């Protein structure tokens, strides 16, 4: 009987180790724009402080990123590709707010999102490199 109980519990002990027990967190990042070349971010992510010109943002799957945007003339999108215009928007996870906002809040809950590289992009100035990477681990 003890062996049966152990065998029943074994998959749970193995399968739920490591990051499966990690709590989801919410990270707030302020976004402004400088000229036609850069977003300036200030806030936190899984690695600690996020600040400066177009930095990479790193979170775990299931975390939420809240961008507080004050970037006149720079529509802010979260995308699957670093591209101009309104295409390639993320379609997984839970978005709150409006993609393309220049002033306001855009939140992305990454529950259900595949691990990998995503992008925050100015849809008007992507050819000039305005934007950066979001890494989901």
Where are these regions (language model features)?
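Sec/Tat signal peptide C-region and signal peptidase I cleavage site
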Residues: 16-22
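Short beta-strand segments of immunoglobulin-like
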Residues: 53-58
């Amino acid at each position: 009987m003890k062996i049966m109980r152990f065998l029943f519990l074994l998959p749970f002990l193995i399968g739920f180790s490591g990051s499966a027990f990690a709590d989801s967190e919410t990270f707030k990042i302020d976004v402004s724009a400088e000229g036609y070349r850069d977003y300036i971010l200030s806030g936190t992510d899984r690695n600690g402080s996020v600040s400066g010109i177009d930095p990479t943002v790193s979170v775990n799957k299931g975390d939420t990123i809240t961008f507080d945007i004050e970037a006149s003339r720079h529509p802010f999108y979260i995308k699957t590709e670093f591209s101009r215009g309104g295409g390639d928007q993320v379609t997984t996870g839970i978005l709150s707010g409006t993609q393309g906002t220049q002033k306001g809040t855009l939140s992305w809950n990454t529950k259900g999102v595949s691990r990998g590289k995503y992008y925050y992009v100015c849809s008007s100035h992507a050819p000039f490199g305005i934007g950066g990477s979001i890494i989901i681990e």
